[in-house]
C-alpha cells in the first residue's frame, strides 16, 4: 500500500472557492463609477451631435456600484438622449454601436420599460425594435440573464 493514502491534505481544499454561485461583494471595484458625464452629453445634444451624445451616455455605466442615485442619474440621462433622437436616425445610431454597447443600450431600454414616463414607452419600443434587428435575440437573452444591472 502507498504511504499517502492516509494523507489528509485533500481536506484543506476549500471547495466553496470554486462555486460560481458564491456571493462576492464587488462594491470596491465600482467605487469610481459615477456614470456618464452629464455635461458632455448635454453639450453634444445642444450641438446637434446625437451620435456623440449616445456614445457619451453609454460610456462609463454604473454597473458595478450599489449607488442607486448614480444608476438613476445614468438611466435618466440615457433616456433623455434616446427621446431626443429623431425616428429616422435611430437605426443608423444602433448600427454604429458595437456588441457590448448594444447590450448596454438594451439594458437601459428594459430599465426604461420598468418606469414609463410621458412619451418614453413609444420611443423605447422604436429603439428596442432597431436594437433587436441589429443585435438579434441573443442580446435580449444576455440582458435578461445578466447579474450586473444598470
UniProtKB/Swiss-Prot annotation:
Going by the UniProt record, its keywords in alphabetical order are: Actin-binding, Cell projection, Cytoplasm, Cytoskeleton, Nucleus
Q: Please give the biological process terms from Gene Ontology that the record holds.
A: Arp2/3 complex-mediated actin nucleation; cell migration; regulation of actin filament polymerization
**Main subcellular location:** cytoplasm
Signal sequence coordinates? none
Annotated region (Disordered), positions in chain: 21-46
Where found, per UniProt?
Answer: Cytoplasm, Cytoskeleton; Cell projection; Nucleus
Q: Does the keyword tRNA processing apply?
A: no
Family the entry assigns: Belongs to the ARPC5 family.
| Subunit and interaction comment | Component of the Arp2/3 complex composed of actr2/arp2, actr3/arp3, arpc1 (arpc1a or arpc1b), arpc2, arpc3, arpc4 and arpc5.
Protein's recorded name: Actin-related protein 2/3 complex subunit 5-A
- Naturally occurring in which organism (per UniProt): Xenopus laevis (African clawed frog)
Amino acid at each position: 500500500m502507498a504511504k499517502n493514502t492516509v494523507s489528509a491534505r485533500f481536506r484543506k481544499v476549500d471547495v466553496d472557492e470554486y462555486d460560481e454561485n458564491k456571493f462576492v461583494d464587488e462594491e470596491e471595484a465600482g467605487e469610481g463609477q459615477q456614470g456618464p458625464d452629464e455635461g458632455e452629453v448635454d453639450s453634444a445634444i445642444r450641438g446637434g451631435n446625437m451620435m456623440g451624445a449616445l456614445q457619451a451616455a453609454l460610456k462609463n455605466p454604473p454597473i458595478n456600484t450599489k449607488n442607486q442615485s448614480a444608476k438613476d442619474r445614468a438611466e435618466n440621462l440615457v433616456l433623455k438622449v434616446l427621446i431626443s433622437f429623431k425616428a429616422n436616425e435611430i437605426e443608423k445610431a444602433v448600427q454604429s454601436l458595437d456588441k457590448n454597447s448594444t447590450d448596454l443600450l438594451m439594458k437601459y431600454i428594459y430599465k426604461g420599460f420598468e418606469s414609463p414616463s410621458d412619451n418614453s414607452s413609444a420611443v423605447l419600443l422604436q429603439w428596442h425594435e432597431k436594437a433587436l434587428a441589429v443585435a438579434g435575440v441573443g442580446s435580449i437573452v444576455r440582458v435578461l440573464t445578466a447579474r450586473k444591472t444598470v
